Regions:
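Non-catalytic connector elements of ABC transporters
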Residues: 1-71
């Protein structure tokens, strides 16, 4: 497996708590400690990354967006 390196420094590890699927997008809620972070990503990304409730993900926070990545 290839390990990704990215320039974003704000990365928070968490667990997917809820996924609300729309036609094109999905709202993914990630529990990070006592906090809940929500990210709107494409439905296709949820499927491609195999994100499910209980999945461990990393929230990558940029000034304009929150991306999700999986190992």
């Amino acid at each position: 497996m290839i390990r990704m390196k990215i320039s974003a420094r704000n990365q928070l590890r968490g667990t997917v708590e809820t996924i609300v699927l729309g036609v094109v997008t999905a709202k993914v809620s990630v529990r990070v400690g006592d906090n809940l972070i929500e990210s709107v990503i494409t439905r296709q990304s949820v499927e491609d990354l195999n994100i499910k409730i209980g999945s461990e993900v990393t929230a990558v926070i940029k000034s304009t967006e929150i991306m999700l990545m999986v190992d």
